[in-house]
């Protein structure tokens, strides 16, 4: 068998060093690479093995590239040695490992522990803020399980280094974010900044207004790493609140995890979704933030009031309001100036939402991660925008890869097609489209935004793909294959030009009979 790339799977407690023919190739929780380690040294931090955790989860897979293997392997006998250390003098030392040859496996399988791995790469410096998170020995376990941790944010002017003094250091509560994506090797996280007693601590981070709920988003399925930021920027240019974001680097329990972006979590706040406070006595007087999302589909998920705190009266009021809106859309009175559908929604609000989701042909549009808000005694508004890493031709399902057809005709849950029977709304949609096309949605402007975002992340993106050697691998979603992030951006731009041309040719042709 020829020499190839290898993966070293390790289930350990609490740290180890791996050597190939006497040369160190992997080190975990035992100080800096190639520094001497006494035989009785304890580890830098605790790490409980998965065997002792007693739950099913992939163990850590470390990538060993072919250049290292070729430089260290020689003809004849070779020695692969492991030095294992505990966090203290105790009888719970544990270690198990396996080595796989990856030479003939091009597909990086996010759901198969054999083919999901990362490379240990040190972070020397970055122009982006550095987020450092330290958990206890259990790490961040299964989905929807919050744990206490510590977080530092390094964000001085100029280049930032992991050794710099932090501008913020404190406690957080953190959990894996997402459903299927929560099992990706590179994970996104929801986190809450806290005081020592566990109460919320509102802090201003990376230039964003003070709050306590945040998201660390990695966009693992998006090889360009810029789709979400591009869409949020377009939403802001349209004049709407979209979550503020900042690219950042993540160091998790001593390991550099690559490029992320730090984002505001969608919630009610004067600097986020600015709706009125709840009214538990007269629920129609309260503000609401809610969404449609899997697995509930047509059921409302409450964001504000919190789903665990919402009263029966509030739930009945909002669900009743939405059901009345949907029933009116399907009735003969849907265009009635007094009793029609416009009494329930801001008639301008769907327009920009439709434009963004048709421009990107987001496969999840009108179906998943779809947010709404309603102010006190007000009507429903669409937004904020969220979750576009599979947009721009990035998904092979729900017609997400097509540059033609309307996405609202495929994903029908939000009844966009029914609303567009209203010729006033349809004409406003076309007028808005052409106005934006002559401005920041022009071909030249969009290509410029893509190039600017992509170039701004160059150094961090290159380092990210050293950590996660998947740039040339087929990942999650697309029916196209690209061998690099550069090729992915070229694909996005070509796909977008075709999509824009199709919308230009069809936006004025939208017509649905009042009886459809």
What are these regions (language model features)?
Residues 3-7, 240-250, 336-340, 441-445:
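Surface-exposed patches in mature extracellular/periplasmic domains of secreted proteins
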Residues 220-240:
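A conserved alpha-helical element in kinase catalytic cores
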Residues 19-23, 253-254:
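Short strand-turn-strand beta-turns centered on an Asx-Gly dipeptide
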């Amino acid at each position: 068998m020829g020499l190839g790339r290898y993966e070293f799977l390790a289930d350990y407690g609490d740290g180890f060093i791996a050597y190939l023919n006497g040369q160190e190739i992997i080190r975990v929780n035992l100080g800096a690479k190639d520094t001497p380690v006494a035989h009785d040294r304890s580890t830098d931090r605790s790490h409980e093995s998965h065997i002792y955790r007693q739950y099913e989860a992939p163990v850590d897979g470390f990538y060993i590239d072919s250049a290292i293997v070729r430089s260290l392997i020689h003809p004849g006998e070779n020695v692969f040695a492991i030095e294992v250390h505990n966090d203290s003098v105790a009888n719970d030392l544990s270690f198990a490992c396996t080595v796989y040859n990856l030479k003939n496996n091009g597909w990086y399988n996010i759901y198969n522990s054999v083919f999901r791995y990362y490379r240990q790469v040190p972070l020397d410096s970055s122009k982006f803020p550095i987020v450092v998170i330290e958990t206890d020995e259990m790490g961040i376990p299964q989905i929807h399980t919050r744990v206490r941790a510590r977080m530092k944010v390094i964000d001085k002017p100029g280049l930032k280094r992991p050794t710099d003094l932090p501008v913020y250091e404190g406690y957080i509560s953190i959990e894996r974010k997402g459903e299927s994506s929560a099992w990706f090797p590179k994970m996104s996280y929801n986190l809450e900044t806290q005081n020592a007693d566990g109460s919320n601590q509102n802090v201003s981070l990376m230039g964003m207004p003070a709050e306590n709920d945040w998201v660390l988003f990695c966009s693992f399925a998006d090889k360009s790493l810029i789709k979400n930021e591009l869409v949020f920027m377009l939403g802001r240019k349209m004049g709407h609140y979209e979550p503020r974001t900042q690219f950042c680097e993540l160091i998790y329990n001593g390991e550099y995890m690559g490029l992320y972006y730090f984002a505001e979590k969608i919630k009610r706040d004067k600097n986020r979704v600015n709706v009125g406070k709840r009214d538990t006595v007269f629920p129609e007087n309260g503000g609401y933030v809610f969404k449609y999302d899997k697995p509930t589909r047509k059921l409302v998920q409450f964001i504000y009031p919190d789903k665990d705190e919402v009263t029966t009266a509030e739930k009945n009021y909002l669900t009743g309001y939405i059901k009345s809106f949907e029933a009116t859309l399907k009735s003969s009175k849907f265009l009635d100036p007094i009793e029609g559908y416009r009494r329930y929604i801001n008639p301008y609000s769907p327009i920009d939402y439709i434009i963004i989701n048709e421009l990107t042909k987001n496969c999840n549009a009108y179906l998943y991660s779809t947010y709404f808000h309603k102010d006190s005694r007000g009507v429903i508004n669409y937004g904020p925008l969220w979750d576009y890493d599979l947009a721009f031709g990035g998904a092979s399902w729900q017609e997400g890869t097509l540059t033609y057809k309307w996405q609202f005709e495929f994903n029908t849950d939000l009844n966009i097609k029914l609303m567009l029977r209203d010729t006033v709304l349809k004409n406003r949609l076309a007028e808005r489209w052409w106005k934006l096309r002559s401005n920041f949605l022009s071909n030249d402007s969009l290509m410029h935004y893509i190039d600017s975002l992509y170039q701004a992340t160059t150094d961090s993106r290159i380092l990210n793909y050293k950590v996660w050697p998947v740039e040339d691998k087929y990942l999650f979603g697309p029916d196209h294959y690209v061998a690099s992030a550069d090729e992915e951006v070229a694909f996005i731009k070509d796909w977008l030009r075709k999509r824009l041309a199709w919308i230009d040719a069809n936006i004025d042709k939208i017509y649905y009979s009042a009886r459809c």
